[in-house]
Amino acid sequence: MWAPPSAGSNAAAIAAAFPQARVLKAFNHFGAEVMASPNGADACVAGDDAAAKAVVLALAKDMGFTPRDAGPLRNAAVLENLAVLWIHLATQSGMGRQFYFAFKTP
């Protein structure tokens, strides 16, 4: 079973190793099939650098995703765990690789 690194997430470990880098977590909670044809799928982006996050959120929108600001980089741990759940559902629960998580409001 996957366990997060001592830094809390892989993204946090990268940020700690490269303190001058503008590290974001994005595009990790769906498969390549959704990347190829997003059709409005939600794409969460977590990071501490507002300017870098704005670029990635705009990129997600331009690609056809519904961009979602997932907050600071510490939330990368949540996104990494969401990816673990996606992998399980895709490979062990019969959902296949062409699904994505959607965040809806009533």
Language-model features: where?
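Rossmann-fold NAD(P)-binding glycine/threonine-rich loop
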Residues: M1-E33, A52
